[in-house]
């Protein structure tokens, strides 16, 4: 029977020359970093479509049963609206979805900054094409500033929107909700843009 070589590595112990894959992986990210990364990813997907939108895309109606925006007597745009969601739900145009983004995001920012939240009727859609794209990009810049100022401790505070003062929901939930709502609306706009381009 052969005698084991004392200089040979013990097969029952980890090889000291092999890196520990877990220990040598990426450094852990904080909750604020992860939420910011998710927001930036969502925005990059949205930007793909914003860069390709034509002014005529905004009011295009893919089906007769649509929600869109209409010129009022004073020249501003007014969205279709119902206090109780209709059954069946109308298909929104790109104009309506972009106004909707501006509405919920502006109100979210009002709450974040401690301002008096604007009413739905206070949110004025700038019009199709570049004005609305600039508006949405401006909201993104303002939201980035909010995210940059948040700490993980801030995320644990009770949310004031969209769940008014419910201790079950925190600022972290609000930030995650913005990411999700923006992704949903960006997907809707992207799908409408591609349908019109293909029609």
Provide a role label for each language-model segment:
Residues 124-156, 173-183:
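Acidic/histidine-rich alpha-helical segments that form the ligand environment
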Residues 2-123, 161-199:
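Short, contiguous alpha-helical
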